[in-house]
Amino acid sequence: MAKIIGIDLGTTNSCVSVMEGGEPVVIPNAEGSRTTPSVVSFQANGERLIGQVAKRQAITNPEKTIISIKRYMGTDHKVNIDSTEYTPQQISAMVLQKLKADAEAYLGEKVTQAVITVPAYFNDSQRQATKDAGKIAGLEVLRIINEPTAASLAYGLDKMDTNEKILVYDLGGGTFDVSILELGDGVFEVKATNGDTKLGGDDFDQKLIDYIAETFKAENGIDLRNDKMAIQRLKEAAEKAKIELSSATQTNINLPFITADATGPKHIDMNLTRAKFNELTHDLVQRTLEPIKKSLEGSGYAMSDIDKIIMVGGSTRIPAVQDAVKDFTGKELSKGVNPDEVVAMGAAIQAGVLTGEVKDVLLLDVTPLTLGIETFGGVSTTLIEKNTTIPTRKSQVFSTAADGQTSVEIHVVQGERSMAADNKTLGRFTLSGIAPAPRGIPQIEVTFDIDANGIVNVSAKDKGTGKEANITITASTNLTDDEIEKAVNEAKKFEAEDKKRKESIEVKNNADQIVYQTEKTLTDLGDKVSAEDKATIEEKVKAVKDVKEGEDLEAIKKATEDLTQTFYGISSKIYQQANPEGAQGAGFDPNNMGGANADNASAGNDKKDDNVVDADFKVEDDK
């Protein structure tokens, strides 16, 4: 059976995992890291960079580098690059394509299906947008799963025989969630969830950026926030300082030549203490405490009922965050999970549940926000309360507001406010063909159906005439089927172009390497090579150099192969002449270009360096 991957599509970093031998395993990316920056960059030559390589060049290419696109999922936000507009779904799809490609390279097989995580407090539009991104990337998204729920799966997989109530505190790069779950006998039941989709590590970085910029402005009269390249350097420095202050009490921010004026270049060289960082970000930390309180209220539990607190997301490494949660809850924090990887691992476990690889696990999640329709007077009438276990279905009968009314518009909203206008509009549809009657007489049954992904379907039926209308909620910010199809084709085109560009680089690098090795070996052999053979080789070298600057890859491959075979034949002849009784000898091997010299090229490749030790990440396990 084909593997289903689990993906944590994060605001700042993403991670991919898969089940192997009944356990979730994090898949390293092509660069060797276990997480991939959710960064996309477009180059002047049309090349597209994704992940760490895109993040590295953000300073020199700030206008065409896209970060934290997840914050715009489910909105009508567009990114304009070279007069081409990209939706958040398309940019996210590019990150997903990178994760998909890394998974395929690791597994050695095609990957077409995935479970993708979203913040628990994502609304319907944001969930739909995430599914669309997966489709554009060439993935069938079998399930959308909430991030805190995924984390609880990874935490509780080896604790199936225990009964625990856990609180998952998930502070990522751009979003924040709190979920209360009950674990017991393989059942993972979410009792309540709350959060803020506009709060995360990016906001902590921004506090530092503003502080550094304001300090610099006070000293030099220049606002660095008006300079895109300078602001990108500030972002990088702020993130680095934040990370360093998690383990040190002071850090130095040194940015030479940050800008210049008539008096010359300007530099930043300042020390930042953890105490100052805590002061700057105190309000952000405090904002995370109210959702804890609301989640407890929604679950019906007291803090004393909670057995474990699981900290998820890179931003939970901030000491002030840990201290605030400990002080607020009065409990020690669990150290049994890796906050950067646990969500992806949970997604892989859910994938294992879907394939049957993981047995005796039942996941019961909830809808994070109240769902209802607008009724007379603009009131929001609730059909499904927040924290209702999904999947679920709920019906309610309504009537007309005017005499002789033959159609009604169903306005579907999501949110906690009493007036429909103050809530998030999920969609509108019309039920027509109602038999004319005095107001209040027709009976119109409205049914809400939420699937396991948290995605909403709404139907309305006139019980008198049997007329029916329904809608799968797709807000105006979501893509139509045609738009998705177009985006899929564009993604395939990008993928093909990237593949061709990569092949071109590899072919040209190989040609360069063989030319270098040939010329070096030719020099080393000296007068052992006849003038005639030397002329033949030099002619073949010139042929490679002539074609390798072009784009005809087949011509480069042919010229390289000709050079390889010609030199191999000549070098073999030389070694045979030097050792007529011996075998072929360790001549120039065109298939082994890794050695620094000919003597080492064909030997010792399998020998392990005794000075190299394998490193592994170890987390403390809670028993």
From Swiss-Prot:
Record-linked Pfam families: HSP70 (PF00012)
Record-annotated disulphide pairs: none
Ranges of Low complexity composition bias in the record: 591-604
ATP-binding in keyword set: yes
Modified residues (Phosphothreonine): 175
Source organism, top-level taxon: Bacteria
Keywords: ATP-binding, Chaperone, Nucleotide-binding, Phosphoprotein, Stress response
Compositional bias ranges of the Basic and acidic residues kind: 605-623
Induction comment: By stress conditions e.g. heat shock.
UniProt keyword annotation of NAD present: no
Region Disordered, residue ranges: 580-623
UniProt-recorded Gene Ontology molecular function terms: ATP binding; ATP-dependent protein folding chaperone; unfolded protein binding
HAMAP family xref list: DnaK
Family: Belongs to the heat shock protein 70 family.
The protein's role, per its UniProt record: Acts as a chaperone.
Name by which UniProt lists this protein: Chaperone protein DnaK
Gene from which this protein is expressed: dnaK
